[in-house]
């Protein structure tokens, strides 16, 4: 069975290409975007619309509530089940998303890491509350600069987890290097969209403005009400800024600007991650769907398996 993966930075057109390939190949789409697993966070995560979901079946959207956890190991297990079901129906599984850790876990397995340390976790969360999340991120940067560079300073959940791992004696980067992700769990065609930077930034900026005009503020308002103003530590980009605007802490243009900058930085991290993957076929627009459909179904030569 051939697995098709459509990856790339945010706003690069992954959903549109995945749907076009699904319609051409008779496929179903498996989400690999860590932000789109949350229920009720639709506009701010650019989740496929009802029309897009009607154009091709989608899996692994709306799995957990905001504030609940989802990690790469759990994602890979859920994706394995979805892919098996798609294959059993005689359809082509198409994985689409920009979360590199999820794609890597699915294609090459998961690193075995130390378990949770509740005492350390509590101490780090207290430090973040007292000194700010960037202070805890700086602690990670001191012990594992490479891991810190891949995690947003405000993503306290991932920062704390990385420090938990480092406290076990080996940093996350050391564990990843030792694992090396050599195992190929699937025969996969990995496509990565690669629009010119100026074009990508323009698309990001336009998308963020459309989010603010199209319901992001309503979603942030609902979160504020649900969590009584104390938003979960790990939310997709944009919700904290939208909530700050609703509280009168940011004017609208500044909130939009900050979210645009955050998405551009996220896109850069996504590209850096993908550049490290093996066997990536970088695709520049415009996309010839017919040619790509033929290409992804061609068996890989044994030498590059």
Swiss-Prot record:
The record marks 99, 121 as: Interaction with substrate tRNA. This is tRNA dimethylallyltransferase. Keywords: ATP-binding, Magnesium, Nucleotide-binding, Transferase, tRNA processing. It catalyses: adenosine(37) in tRNA + dimethylallyl diphosphate = N(6)-dimethylallyladenosine(37) in tRNA + diphosphate. NCBIfam families: miaA (TIGR00174). One of its GO terms (biological process) is tRNA modification. Substrate binds at residues 10-15. The gene is miaA. One of its GO terms (molecular function) is ATP binding. ATP binds at residues 8-15. The lineage of its organism: Bacteria, Pseudomonadati, Myxococcota, Myxococcia, Myxococcales. Belongs to the IPP transferase family. Its cofactor is Mg(2+). The keyword Transferase applies. It comes from the Bacteria. Its EC number is 2.5.1.75. It comes from Anaeromyxobacter sp. (strain K). Residues 33-36 are annotated as: Interaction with substrate tRNA. Catalyzes the transfer of a dimethylallyl group onto the adenine at position 37 in tRNAs that read codons beginning with uridine, leading to the formation of N6-(dimethylallyl)adenosine (i(6)A).
């Amino acid at each position: 069975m051939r697995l098709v993966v459509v990856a790339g930075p945010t706003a690069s057109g992954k959903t549109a290409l995945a749907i076009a390939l699904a319609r051409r190949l008779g496929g179903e789409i498996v989400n690999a975007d860590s932000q789109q697993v949350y229920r009720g966070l639709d506009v701010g995560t650019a989740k496929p619309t009802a029309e897009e979901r009607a154009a091709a079946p989608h899996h692994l959207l709306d799995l957990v509530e905001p504030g609940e956890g989802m990690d790469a190991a759990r994602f890979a297990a859920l994706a394995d089940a979805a892919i098996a079901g798609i294959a059993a129906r005689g359809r082509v599984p198409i994985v689409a998303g920009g979360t590199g850790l999820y794609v890597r876990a699915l294609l090459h397995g998961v690193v075995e890491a130390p378990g949770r340390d509740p005492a350390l976790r509590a101490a780090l969360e207290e430090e973040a509350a007292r000194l700010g999340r960037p202070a805890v991120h700086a602690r990670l940067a001191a012990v594992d600069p490479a891991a810190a560079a891949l995690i947003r300073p405000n993503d306290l959940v991932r920062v704390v987890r990385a420090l938990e791992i480092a406290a076990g004696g080996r940093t996350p980067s050391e564990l990843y290097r030792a694992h090396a992700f050599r195992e190929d769990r699937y025969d996969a065609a990995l496509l990565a969209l690669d629009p010119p930077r100026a074009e990508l930034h323009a698309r990001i900026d336009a998308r963020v403005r459309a989010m603010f005009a199209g319901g992001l503020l309503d979603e942030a308002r609902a979160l504020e009400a649900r969590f009584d103003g104390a938003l979960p530590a790990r939310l997709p980009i944009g919700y904290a800024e939208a909530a700050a605007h609703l509280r009168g802490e940011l004017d609208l243009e500044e909130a939009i600007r900050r979210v645009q900058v955050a998405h551009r930085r996220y896109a850069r991290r996504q590209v850096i991650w993908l550049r490290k993957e093996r066997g990536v076929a970088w695709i520049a627009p415009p996309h010839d769907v017919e040619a790509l459909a033929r290409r992804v179904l061609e068996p890989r030569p044994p030498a590059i398996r």
